[in-house]
């Protein structure tokens, strides 16, 4: 069973609808025992980084997440959940979870697209991922596939944790982490067939690890 972390700052219901469509058993929960026993955890998030961290820390879920990552529990962070796995976010001057070294930065509106036009902030719409490392999440996904983004801040982890990049004015990290701990800036639950496949790949990985 996949646990969808409920901390009042996520897009839990849209993630759950996607998992239900795939027939993947899941539960939206903030119960620490349920989270600890889950096959894997999806850590969604929308809104502001500061509010998200406040909600996590108020219930002690920040320390639980760190402990579960230390125990190699598979975890997938989405959007704000992706960003606050890093050390720091410029949004609200937020000290984050420090699970992955790096920080989250505001897009520079002076960046220009391929036509020389300044980019719009937030980055909103469909874009591609260029993998910099092999990633099991992208198994059997078309390299030309597009995923849905909506964000004003982007993750900037240490280089060795960058798994995929997307171009918006210039390249930025849109997928980071390591095996068993992944963070995506885009919304797989809103990305049609490629996004559903990514979620399915995450679940299959979780089952393999659980059965090992």
From Swiss-Prot:
The active site is at 79 (nucleophile), 187, 189. GO terms for molecular function: glutaminase activity; imidazoleglycerol-phosphate synthase activity; lyase activity. SUPFAM superfamilies: Class I glutamine amidotransferase-like (SSF52317). The keyword Lyase applies. It comes from Maridesulfovibrio salexigens (strain ATCC 14822 / DSM 2638 / NCIMB 8403 / VKM B-1763) (Desulfovibrio salexigens). This is Imidazole glycerol phosphate synthase subunit HisH. Its EC number is 4.3.2.10, 3.5.1.2. HAMAP family: HisH. Residues 1-212 form the Glutamine amidotransferase type-1 domain. InterPro entries: Class_I_gatase-like, GATASE, Imidazole-glycPsynth_HisH. It holds the Pfam family GATase. Its main location: cytoplasm.
């Amino acid at each position: 069973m996949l646990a969808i972390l409920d901390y009042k700052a996520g897009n839990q219901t849209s993630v759950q609808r996607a998992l239900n469509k795939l027939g993947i058993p899941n539960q939206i929960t903030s119960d620490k025992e349920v989270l600890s026993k889950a096959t894997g955890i999806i850590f969604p998030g929308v809104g502001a980084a500061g509010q998200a961290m406040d909600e996590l820390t108020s219930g002690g879920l920040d320390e639980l997440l760190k402990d579960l990552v230390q125990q190699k529990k598979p975890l997938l962070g989405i959007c704000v959940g992706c960003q606050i796995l890093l050390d720091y976010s410029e949004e609200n001057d937020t000290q984050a979870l420090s699970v992955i070294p790096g920080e989250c930065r505001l897009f520079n509106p002076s960046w220009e697209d391929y036509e020389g036009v300044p980019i719009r902030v937030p980055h909103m719409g469909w874009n591609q991922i260029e993998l910099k490392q092999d990633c099991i999440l992208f198994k059997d996904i078309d390299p030309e596939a597009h995923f849905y983004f909506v964000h004003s801040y982007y993750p900037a982890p240490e280089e060795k944790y960058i798994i995929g990049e997307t171009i918006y004015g210039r390249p930025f990290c849109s997928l980071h982490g390591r095996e068993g701990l992944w963070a995506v800036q885009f919304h797989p639950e809103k990305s049609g067939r490629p996004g559903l496949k990514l979620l399915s790949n995450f679940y299959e990985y979780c089952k393999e690890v659980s059965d090992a």
